Amino acid sequence: MPDNPKLPARAWLIVGLLWVGGCLNYLDRVIITTMRTSLQASIPMTEAQFGLLTTAFLLVYGGLSPFAGYLADRFSRSRVIITSLFVWSLITWLTAQAKTYEQMLVTRMLMGVSEACFIPAALALVADYHRGATRSLATGFVLGGVMIGSALGGLGGWIAERSHWSHAFSLFGLIGIVFACVLLVLLRDPPRENGDRATLAQAGSTVRLGEAIKSLFSSRNFILAFIYWGVLGIAAWMVIGWMPTYLQEHFHLPQGRAGLVATVYVNVASLIGLLVGGLWADRWSRTNPRACIYVTAIGLGIAVPAILLVCTTPLLPLAIVGLVLYGLTIAFASTEMMPILCLILDPRYIATGFGVLNLFACLVGGATTFAGGALRDAHIEVSRLFQAGAASMVVCAVMLLFIKPGVAGTSIPTGKLDC
């Protein structure tokens, strides 16, 4: 039976603090997408230039993710988180001072640099604090904050309509700066205890980026996880990118309603799924160290028929049922990814490993969205894209079953690699 060590003090306080941090992380990055009209009225730019603001952010954010993860493995995770939050909040505030398109573009690129450091460090810190049968649920809570922040991004457009676009950046930037000061007082790395993961992850030889990357890709388990995450990204981005279009065309919905149906039901269900999947895996992990793997595979097994229901039924209510089931169960994959990495990686390289996966997810997301558009130009039905996504999820579920707990080339016992 896996070990279930006593939680360090502040373990759930840390989760709460990182929930707020995750919310601000996504809120600050997405508010710009909700105020296009106001922004273009103030700073002249073409539609392509407006799109480039987000593309530039993603390129920098994704490209630096492995290095950002390395920083969280090499230095104090809590200090990396606090620095990241303070810097991106300062840049958010500075964005409000931009007067030209070039200044706006530079702030978005700098935002990518600073925000890249947060998620790998935050999820790794959660894993350090929650070493037993609370890790998946704690991870789910933090990712829930990310989803809430993404949903609250619409506040940017609301503020821009009623005052000025810059006021949203000023407000949320100042909130982030104040919260960074709060974290400076409250956020700490966990106390070190002999044999626990926090010690294993932070002690020993100095972590070097080249050695970390070499160690990751010399692991059969990590290569499987890497491919799995990329293939799953293809399926997820197909749904994210093209579900509104499919609902609009197939059910003859107005554009606004199609967008709401495609996002609200899935996101609400996913928020619940993060917690349900985390709680389920944690309870199961008390008797089975591979629980986080099995819960993810089961979730994918349910998500496949759910998305097939959406793309085959002629009835909108049934399609909504399929969307809810899909959102609920696909979220298991997100909440269990860090626990799975904790099963298979050298503890010194946990955040670096997540950063590498983050980079791959950004690349896959961009390529999949573009490829979907190209297939649409070739008059391929959107339902075919979803069927391909369902097939991809089947492949992912099978790949997961080949991932085995344990770290190749180390003396770390499997019993220490708890979910």
What are these regions (language model features)?
Residues G63-K99:
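Conserved MFS/SLC helix-loop-helix module at the cytosolic interface between two early adjacent transmembrane helices
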Residues P2-L7, P191-F226, H250:
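Juxtamembrane intracellular "pre-TM" segments in multi-pass secondary transporters
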Residues T107-G145:
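Cytoplasmic helix-loop-helix junction between adjacent transmembrane helices
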Residues I32-T33, R220-L275, I330, S334, ...:
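Extracytoplasmic gate region of multi-pass secondary transporters
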Residues P44, S76, Q97-Q103, R131, ...:
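Helix-breaking motifs and short loop linkers at transmembrane-helix boundaries and internal kinks
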Residues V142, V146-D189:
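Helix-loop-helix hairpin linking two adjacent transmembrane segments in secondary transporters
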Residues R79-W93, A291-I307:
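Structural signature of the two symmetry-related core transmembrane helices
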Residues V30, L58-P66, S150-A151, N267-L275, ...:
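Residue-level signature of mid-helix packing/kink "hotspots" within the transmembrane helices
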